[in-house]
Regions:
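Short, well-ordered beta-strand elements within core beta-sheets of diverse protein domains
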Residues: 72-76, 97-99
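Glycine-rich Rossmann-fold phosphate-binding loop(s) that bind the pyrophosphate
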Residues: 300
Length: 383
């Protein structure tokens, strides 16, 4: 990103796109590609995102689906078209991309060659919400608009739905992102490090044999609470040689108790994630035009009952957990909507509420969690 910012200021890039600055955004990848080897550019007819490339292979038709394009940091979120000034820096023009279509658009039928290979005929291919979080958020079993969502997996993505982009000095300072929603809405959200921390620790613990997530949670439950905290989003946790050592080093450098056992380390991670969610939810509430009364946790991480409970306690609001396979469910029901079987987003969410059994977790010991929040904030700021 820094090389790109030499050509256009970081603030200007954010103002034009509303997308969180991250080094893997398509804008920066294409910039680096051109600088390091531009031989492919003259040979390129169209640039397709991966979901659109798959659709092309199935149908022979090229499109650019809105939700995946919105994450590229090349799209104007107000006009929903590629920003020419950003493309020009990368020696590109809008005609290098296929036409932008909304989620739920019928791209076409399976091509003849695919039909021959598969034995399937007259099958429509739908442009689903190509960004997995957009599909997952569609599957949030919300009853009204006064909620935030947390798509919980290796990454935790916490946000709200907005009818319009929210791009201002606050969102820039907090590095919030404005990604496209499946219904053309905006998903104002923050990327947070999620289960990555526990996944990497689990690899270390399994050197001596298999360790289950249930065993990790049980060990954490048996450990003393609120002994040490980390900032889950600290760069030192991005790709350390040993996640356990990185967590211990963080605690050592901030003058805290140094966790040693599996339970102590896991508890440190879960409590710190819950407090990080509290932090981000507070920022979201300051940006939202409505009261956030509930947090919906969806995705694989929603199966972690301990973290769900910790999160409810930390935020002081009810948490509704599930469904765990939100991305797949949202994808399927969006196709049902395209086929005319389902009317709209509200009906999709009603179907999900009736088809699955989301678990509601009420907050407990809120004052105790509030007391220890300041200790988390001290070490969060310190590194």
């Amino acid at each position: 990103p820094e090389r790109f910012f030499a050509k256009m200021a970081k603030e200007e890039v954010y103002r034009k796109t509303g997308i969180q600055i991250m080094n893997f955004n398509s804008l920066f990848q294409l910039s680096t590609q051109f600088e390091e080897d531009n031989s492919i550019y003259p040979l390129t007819d169209k640039i397709l995102f991966i979901p659109d490339a798959l659709s092309y292979l199935l149908t022979g038709h090229m499109v650019t689906e809105y939700t995946i394009a919105s994450t590229s940091q090349m799209l104007n979120p107000y006009l929903r078209e590629f920003d020419t000034s950003l493309l020009e820096i990368n020696h590109l023009s809008p005609d290098k991309f296929a036409p932008i279509v909304t989620s739920g658009t019928v791209i076409g039928q399976l091509s003849e060659s695919v039909s021959r290979q598969t034995g399937m005929k007259d099958i429509s291919v739908i442009a689903v919400a190509g960004h997995d979080t957009a599909s997952a958020v569609l599957a949030t079993p919300a009853e009204n608009e006064n909620f935030a969502y947390l798509s919980s997996g290796t990454w935790s993505l916490m946000g709200i739905e907005s009818k319009v982009p929210v791009i201002n000095e606050k969102t820039y300072a907090l590095n919030f992102t404005n990604e496209g929603g499946s219904d053309g809405s905006i998903r104002l959200l923050k990327n947070i490090c999620g289960m990555w921390l526990i996944e990497q620790c689990k690899k270390d613990w399994e050197i001596n044999g298999t360790v289950t997530y249930q065993e990790i949670v049980q060990a954490a439950e048996a450990s003393v609470p609120f002994r040490c905290f980390i900032n889950p989003d600290s760069p030192c946790f991005a790709s350390p040689q040993s996640m356990i050592s990185a967590i211990q080093d963080y605690c050592r450098q901030t003058g805290q108790y140094i966790p040693e056992t599996m339970g102590e380390i896991a508890r440190c991670i879960y409590e710190s994630l819950a407090y990080r969610y509290k932090q981000v939810l507070s920022n979201l509430q300051n940006l939202a035009s409505f009261p956030i009364n509930t947090l919906h946790i969806i995705g694989g991480g929603s199966q972690n009952k301990m973290l769900n409970s910790f999160t409810a306690n930390a935020i002081g609001k009810p948490v509704i957990a599930g469904p765990s396979e939100a991305t797949a469910i949202g994808n399927i029901l969006l196709q049902a909507q395209a086929a005319g079987v389902v009317k709209d987003k509200n009906e999709i969410r009603q179907i999900i509420r009736h088809s699955f059994e989301p678990e509601t977790i009420e907050p407990q010991n809120v004052s105790l969690w509030e007391e220890n929040y300041n200790n988390y904030l001290k070490v969060y700021k310190e590194l």
